[in-house]
């Protein structure tokens, strides 16, 4: 077993060796530009790009013509949310989303608010899931877009997307789904789930970083305004020379996910449960955040009461985990996702996200259980609050003295 141990699979995944092998020729011998139509180098590159497009489409039950290559899921989210809002704004300027979305969606929504759009930010239930009835109640005659993720990047909680998609479809509203954390881990089908736009990332499913895709429905056709102008690549949706090696890698990653996903999900879920039960045996006052029933296989988001998450992360340097999402864990604010779910500020501050995946082992899980057990106990020994709770004191009943 190699130290440090990687348990942050929601932030990124290692590139699968089979993916790397598929990519290598496109750096060295097959280096053509896929847009070069006049010679064999370009044709070879285009052929590889189209084969990868087929694989990504197959993974989500779409047609290859509905896959648009991007530089990653942040760009896909921006193109979907802003592109749809700008195209349909004559019909209305009201958008609906959830407070626990990824920052790429939330910040796109805030940018649109500054342009005069009105956004309804819905609160999830205590278990992290969004109630479809709330979406239905939020729709208005001028609503043009609903954007709800499939699986949350912090809690791994899976929303009832098919139901939300059906509500949007019946109301004639475009439905965007950020499916970055679910595609390749659990089934995702654009037809069964009534999805019009879906964001996909390669590096969250053992592909390379810096490449992603946006699914754009053709029947009934969904229209977007391009957010990037240039040579009109990708049917005008997204100009820019295609990253051929990255796209080939994403195609291979999609193929492997399609073939191995179900068996992998069983193995990774077993590892997650081993981790959860092990931590629960080692420690008291431990809270799992979000629904365990509706959750992606490798996610465990846990709050260790009376321990500061950042202090714990420093104490367990041998295990790579995160507090909050990788995109925002640089800020010391407690997780906005957990706060929106109604988790107290103290518990949100003490939360750790474990992400297990394809290359995680039982040995690594057992090591993490021992290490976290030891370090949490040590940090709690220094916490007067923990001592008081153990002595049966109800902290809510205490009148704290004002320090001023």
From Swiss-Prot:
Biological processes annotated in GO: [2Fe-2S] cluster assembly
Cofactor section: pyridoxal 5'-phosphate
Residues that, per the record, bind pyridoxal 5'-phosphate: 73-74, 153, 181, 201-203, 241
Molecular-function GO terms, alphabetical: 2 iron, 2 sulfur cluster binding; cysteine desulfurase activity; metal ion binding; pyridoxal phosphate binding
A GO cellular component annotation in the UniProt record: L-cysteine desulfurase complex
Pfam short name (any one): Aminotran_5
InterPro entries, alphabetized: Aminotrans_V_dom (IPR000192), Aminotrans_V_PyrdxlP_BS (IPR020578), Cys_deSase_IscS (IPR010240), Cysteine_dSase (IPR016454), PyrdxlP-dep_Trfase (IPR015424), PyrdxlP-dep_Trfase_major (IPR015421), PyrdxlP-dep_Trfase_small (IPR015422)
EC number(s) reported in the record: 2.8.1.7
Keywords recorded for this protein, A-Z: 2Fe-2S, Cytoplasm, Iron, Iron-sulfur, Metal-binding, Pyridoxal phosphate, Transferase
Swiss-Prot/TrEMBL catalytic activity: (sulfur carrier)-H + L-cysteine = (sulfur carrier)-SH + L-alanine
Binding residues for [2Fe-2S] cluster: 327
Entry annotation: catalytic residues: 327
Family according to the record: Belongs to the class-V pyridoxal-phosphate-dependent aminotransferase family. NifS/IscS subfamily.
Record-linked PANTHER family: CYSTEINE DESULFURASE, CYSTEINE DESULFURYLASE FAMILY MEMBER
Job description of the protein: Master enzyme that delivers sulfur to a number of partners involved in Fe-S cluster assembly, tRNA modification or cofactor biosynthesis. Catalyzes the removal of elemental sulfur atoms from cysteine to produce alanine. Functions as a sulfur delivery protein for Fe-S cluster synthesis onto IscU, an Fe-S scaffold assembly protein, as well as other S acceptor proteins.
Subunit details: Homodimer. Forms a heterotetramer with IscU, interacts with other sulfur acceptors.
Identification of the protein by name: Cysteine desulfurase IscS
Source organism of this protein record: Anaeromyxobacter dehalogenans (strain 2CP-C)
Lineage, broadest ranks: Bacteria, Pseudomonadati, Myxococcota, Myxococcia, Myxococcales
Gene assigned in the entry: iscS
């Amino acid at each position: 077993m190699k130290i440090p141990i990687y348990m942050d699979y929601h932030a990124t995944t290692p590139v699968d060796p089979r993916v790397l092998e598929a990519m290598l020729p496109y750096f060295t011998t097959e280096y053509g530009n896929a847009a070069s139509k006049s010679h064999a180098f370009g044709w070879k590159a285009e052929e590889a790009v189209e084969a990868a497009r087929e694989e990504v489409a197959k993974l989500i039950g779409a047609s290859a013509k509905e896959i648009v290559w991007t530089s990653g899921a942040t760009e896909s989210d921006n193109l979907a949310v802003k592109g749809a809002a700008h195209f349909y704004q004559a019909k209305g300027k009201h958008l609906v989303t959830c407070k626990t979305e990824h920052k790429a969606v939330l910040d796109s929504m805030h940018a649109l608010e500054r342009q005069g759009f009105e956004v309804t930010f819905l609160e999830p239930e205590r278990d992290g899931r969004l109630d479809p009835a709330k979406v239905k109640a939020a729709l208005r005659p001028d609503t043009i877009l609903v954007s709800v993720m499939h699986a949350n990047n912090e809690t791994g909680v899976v929303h009832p997307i098919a139901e939300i998609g059906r509500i949007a479809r019946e109301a004639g509203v475009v439905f965007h789904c950020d499916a970055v954390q679910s595609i390749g881990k659990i089934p995702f089908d654009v037809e069964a789930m009534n999805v019009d736009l879906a964001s996909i990332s390669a590096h969250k499913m053992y592909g390379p970083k810096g490449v992603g895709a946006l699914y754009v429905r053709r029947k009934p056709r969904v229209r977007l305004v391009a957010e990037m102008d240039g040579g009109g690549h990708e049917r005008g949706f997204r100009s820019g020379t295609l990253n051929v090696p990255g796209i080939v890698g994403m195609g291979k990653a999609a193929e492997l996910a399609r073939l191995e996903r179900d068996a992998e999900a069983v193995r990774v879920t077993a590892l997650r449960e081993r981790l959860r039960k092990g931590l629960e045996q080692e420690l008291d006052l431990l809270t799992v955040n979000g629904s365990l029933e509706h959750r992606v296989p490798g996610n465990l988001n846990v709050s260790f009461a009376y321990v500061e998450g950042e202090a714990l992360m420093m104490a367990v340097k041998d295990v790579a985990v995160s507090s909050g999402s990788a995109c925002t864990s640089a800020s010391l604010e407690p997780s906005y996702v957990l706060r929106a779910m109604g988790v107290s500020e103290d518990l949100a501050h003490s939360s750790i996200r474990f992400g297990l995946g394809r290359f995680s082992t039982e040995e690594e899980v057992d090591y993490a259980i021992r290490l976290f057990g030891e370090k949490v106990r040590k940090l709690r020994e220094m916490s007067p609050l923990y001592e008081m709770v153990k002595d049966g004191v109800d902290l809510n009943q205490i009148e704290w003295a004002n320090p001023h």
